[in-house]
Amino acid sequence: MRLDVISIFPDYLAPLELSLIGKARQDGLLELNVHDLRAFTTDRHRTVDDTPYGGGAGMVMKPEPWALALASVVEPAAKSKPVLIVPSPAGEVFNQRIAEELAAESHLVFACGRYEGIDERVVDWARESFTVRPMSLGDYVLNGGEVAVMAMVEATARLLPGVVGNPDSLLEESHQDGLLEYPVYTKPSAWRGVDIPAVLLSGNHAKIARFRRDEQLRRTAQRRPDLLTQLDPAILDRADLAVLRESGYLTVDGVLTRTSELG
């Protein structure tokens, strides 16, 4: 996979040189290029922003440097359009499913906006050469797109074959099956007067699997009930449904619903 990141603060992306993503780059599992947007300006001050038409606070990123920067990363002979991700609080909310979609692509480009954002004409212009996906990390505002891009790059790149040492670990993480991950424990089994759940010492793999599944369901119901409404009850077994009933959920018209919301 090839990834290109465009930013006015290329040094901000230095953490991508570390840990698993940095090692994946060294091992040739992914190609990651960081570009300085100011290198595509044409004035001596290397200006990348200007005042907004219509008035208002802040500055807007100029279109021409962005057009030149984006054009520089397009491969004319590519079989498919690269995906252009534009971090924006007005974009679709990034999640694990989107990370999986992006991990299946061959070329991703990330446009790190600053100030009040990038001139909207750039987004429209880019659609001819890119599949454009404005993307948000959540319902809050950051100073720029770099933090969001680092999160999205890591969430996506770690799904590539060979990046994570044990691929089975990817199957047991939060959100992989639409639920939060179960709690985990390590040695010692007794710590400051607190013991780990006894079932984890039983050696009974079926009981351990059931315990972990139950904890996933309880934790999701407590912390992220919104995820349960997106879950297909058809994939749940009787034990799953029993745990959810204890947590205050029933299946109504094919949707998991809080019992407190029923008349």
From Swiss-Prot:
What is the name of this protein?
tRNA (guanine-N(1)-)-methyltransferase
List the molecular function annotations (GO) for this entry.
tRNA (guanine(37)-N1)-methyltransferase activity
Quote the subcellular location field of this record: Cytoplasm
**Matches recorded under InterPro entries:** Alpha/beta_knot_MTases, tRNA_m1G_MeTrfase_C_sf, tRNA_m1G_MeTrfase_TrmD, tRNA_m1G_MTases_N, tRNA_MeTrfase_TRMD/TRM10
Q: State the NCBIfam families in the record.
A: PRK00026.1, trmD
Example of a GO biological process term: tRNA N1-guanine methylation
User: What organism is the protein native to?
Assistant: Renibacterium salmoninarum (strain ATCC 33209 / DSM 20767 / JCM 11484 / NBRC 15589 / NCIMB 2235)
User: What high-level taxonomic lineage is stated for the organism?
Assistant: Bacteria, Bacillati, Actinomycetota, Actinomycetes, Micrococcales
Quote the subunit structure annotation: Homodimer.
Q: What does this protein do?
A: Specifically methylates guanosine-37 in various tRNAs.
Q: Where does S-adenosyl-L-methionine bind?
A: G113, L137, G138, D139, Y140, V141, L142
